[in-house]
Amino acid sequence: MAILIDKNTKVICQGFTGGQGTFHSEQALAYGTQLVGGVSPNKGGTTHLGLPVFNTVREAVENTGVTATVIYVPASFCKDAIIEAIDAGIQLIVCITEGIPTLDMLKVKQKLNETGVVMIGPNCPGVITPDECKIGIMPAHIHKKGKVGIVSRSGTLTYEAVKQTTDEGFGQSTCVGIGGDPIPGSSFIDILERFQQDPETEAIVMIGEIGGSAEEEAAIFIKDNVTKPVVAYIAGITAPKGKRMGHAGAIISGGKGTAVEKIAALEAAGVTCVKSLAEIGEALRKLLKSSKN
């Protein structure tokens, strides 16, 4: 099962012939992802990496039956690229690009809400279902097929959680980087709900950070809806108020969005919060052992 993507997912790349699109498409193909082509305006009719290039997403859909796209285009063009994909009937959009203007994302978010299309990102590492499909920039070799679902606002912190779950022998069902921007395509709740419904996912790792209220909202959802064990890590416990810490969304404003508040909300919902990333594997081991007893 897994969530969002599997071995049957057909993918195209928008920004296919650019430097980033080329490199990460090569990596995806090497992993076994069903990348069936790409889109680069004015280059339709040519081939790249042995795959067809189309001028528009609609042409790609009509010719390949693709259902997912990954976007590697500059921030100023992302809104149009995302909306083009939605209008063409793509069901899953993964946008890696950082720095999309907030007003552009507001328009995108409205379109997503109107159509029900799923978007992961922007400013994210992407999605991977180990040994089946990789859409994004994550290092493939640290992943192992297994039973832990991982959802995170951070890219590199996700990789640490992945490495620990691999080393512990648990592996991952699917790993989703929802991104660190203030307006994400998908929230923690969207992904937690999918993991709760997925029979292959036995436990969940959630990695949050300061800023916004996504973790507090997730805590309410977990308390009422999630029966599987959840381990969480919140980055930024020492962050000063009013200073952006890496991601655009990682800022404590008006005294809200602190790590302490988020940890308290999650613990009140029954989530096991670890103080260090290094403790994720051990915490999972204890939770999974106790859940079987």
Swiss-Prot record:
- Name one cellular component (GO) term: succinate-CoA ligase complex (ADP-forming)
The record, for Gene3D superfamilies, names: NAD(P)-binding Rossmann-like Domain (3.40.50.720), Succinyl-CoA synthetase domains (3.40.50.261)
One short Pfam family name for this protein?
Ligase_CoA
Q: In which pathway does it act?
A: Carbohydrate metabolism; tricarboxylic acid cycle; succinate from succinyl-CoA (ligase route): step 1/1
Q: What is its EC class?
A: ligase
List, from the UniProt record, the residues annotated as the active site of this protein: H247
Stated family: Belongs to the succinate/malate CoA ligase alpha subunit family.
Instruction: Quote the subunit structure annotation.
Output: Heterotetramer of two alpha and two beta subunits.
What does this protein do, in the record's words? Answer: Succinyl-CoA synthetase functions in the citric acid cycle (TCA), coupling the hydrolysis of succinyl-CoA to the synthesis of either ATP or GTP and thus represents the only step of substrate-level phosphorylation in the TCA. The alpha subunit of the enzyme binds the substrates coenzyme A and phosphate, while succinate binding and nucleotide specificity is provided by the beta subunit.
Q: What is this protein called?
A: Succinate--CoA ligase [ADP-forming] subunit alpha
Q: Which organism is it from?
A: Haemophilus influenzae (strain ATCC 51907 / DSM 11121 / KW20 / Rd)
Report which gene this protein is encoded by: sucD
